[in-house]
Amino acid sequence: MVEFSTYESSSCTVWSSLFISGTGQKEYHLIMRPDCGGGFPEQYFALRKALGEFIEGEGSVRPIFMRWFLSDASNQLALVEDEDCAVSFIEQPPLDGTKVAL
């Protein structure tokens, strides 16, 4: 079974796909983009906040893999926090003109 939903925080949009196996195991795939203006720090921390809110709202879920899309990786990586999961960084600016997407 697959469920699709959209979550809007005050500064981000989150598109969620929930896959539920026959045994009840859940797997989420999220696409997140900031809706706020400003530079990379504001947009990055808005995404972090929205991710935290999503995880808190869903209960016992945790990230397994994150793929960050950065507009200027060489200058932005210093601000990115360490994660407790596998992470990849793609230096490809999001098409909507933002500085970062997840």
Model region roles, listed by residue range:
Residues 1-101:
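Short, polar/acidic, helix-capping and beta-turn segments at strand->helix junctions
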